Amino acid sequence: MAIEKVIIQNFKKFKNPFEVKFNENINLLVGDNESGKSTILEAIHVALTGMYAGRNIRNQLSTYLFNREAVEEYLASVKNEQPIAPPEIMIELYFKSGTLPEYEGNGNSEKSDGIEGIRFTISFSDKFNSEYESLLKTEKITSLPIEFYEAKWFSFSRDEKMPRFIPIKSVMIDSSNYRYQNGSDVYISRVVKDFLEPEDITAITQAHRNMIDEFAQNEAIQSIYEKISAASTVMKGKLSLSADQEV
């Protein structure tokens, strides 16, 4: 197997750096429900292909991709007027030596030389610093400002990459998460991409995020949260309703 190790941080259930090692043959992930088996596979797939749930990850960045505890810590710091850095998703794939020599370097979280691999991040983009500072001063932030985030890929040699040019590929078969795009979806996405300026898209995303925040804080929805959680006998964690964050 080309991948020897995966390190995941702040992606879904994995807050602190979580490491999984693989052998060259068949690898089986065994664990209880909600232990993160599917999340590990999703992390590998998105880091290699840029696809999540059947769609380009750049088109569906969402706070739900982030570890909830990390997001809550960030929001608490903003509320206390001592904001910490917005959380960042990091996925690193360590390749077997000799797989992709041009991907070799120390651009990894371990700062180790002579290692081949790819580093995928969903992180706050510094180009939005002024807009973010303005948001902190003028608005009450109750959710992650995902409109200021970008998804990027880098080889361990620190060269930025496009996922379609990463030679190693993965196939993830999970029909439960696959979402098909109809003709109108494709047309609207093309219009947004081709005709709107970046500041227009940011404004739309902020308005959409505010709408979702209002939905989550609605008293009727809060009451339904409590009923759902009380009725649930399948999962240990809390169940809740949420509005779709795709724009």
Residue spans of the language-model regions?
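Pre-Walker A-like glycine/lysine-rich segment at the N-terminus of P-loop NTPase domains
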Residues: 1-50, 55-70, 79
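Short flexible coil/turn linkers enriched for glycine and charged/polar residues
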Residues: 14, 85, 233-235
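Residues in well-ordered beta-strands of folded domains
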Residues: 21, 92-94, 121, 152-154, ...
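Non-catalytic alpha-helical coupling and interface elements of nucleotide-dependent molecular machines
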Residues: 45-53, 125, 156, 193, ...
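Extended helical coiled-coil dimerization/tether regions that scaffold
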Residues: 187-247
